[in-house]
Regions:
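Active-site-proximal mixed secondary-structure blocks
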Residues: 1-37, 45-156
């Protein structure tokens, strides 16, 4: 007899029932009005780590999410790695509801934000980064990477 228990697969099964040793990150992106919005993710991993003129990360997210739509629209995001403090996770969960508008969730957000190094160095408008992040990767969407220039974004 197996020592494992058979679990019923439910919505968000990977968050509620499975263990993947993945970091939890907060992705910061720019809204249409230039303000920063945040979304928590754990489905992120290195994509290209060597042998290229650049490095790449792979983010799995719904194409209709605010995060995906903002990245497709302006090609910028920051990957903010957060600590594993329960208070930090509680704050991350508040940002995770699909359909929440940035204008509704961001005023209640307790994460402190600051300009990232790229914006300071270039003056280019970029998503703000979490002040208390363990580390931050500031990213630019390479639209042509592996045919990504064929991706579409939708305005709902």
């Amino acid at each position: 007899m197996s020592s494992f228990e058979n679990l019923r697969i439910v919505d968000n099964f990977y968050q509620t029932s499975l263990f993947f040793p993945m970091p939890t990150v907060i992705i910061s992106t720019l809204c249409e009005d230039g303000s920063t919005t945040l979304g928590p993710y754990s489905l992120i991993q290195p994509y290209y780590v060597a042998g290229k003129d650049y490095y790449a990360m792979l983010l799995s997210c719904r194409n209709s999410s605010n995060t995906a739509q903002n990245i497709l629209r302006n090609g910028k995001c920051a990957i903010n790695f957060i600590d594993d403090n329960p208070k930090t996770f509680k704050e991350a969960v508040k940002l995770s509801w699909p359909g929440d508008k940035p204008s509704d969730k961001m005023p209640k957000c307790k994460f402190k934000l600051e300009d990232g190094i790229t914006q300071e160095e270039t003056g280019e408008l970029r998503p703000k980064v979490l002040t208390d992040a363990i580390e931050v990767i500031e990213c630019t969407w390479v639209r042509e990477l592996d045919g990504a220039d064929k991706d579409k974004f939708y305005i709902f």
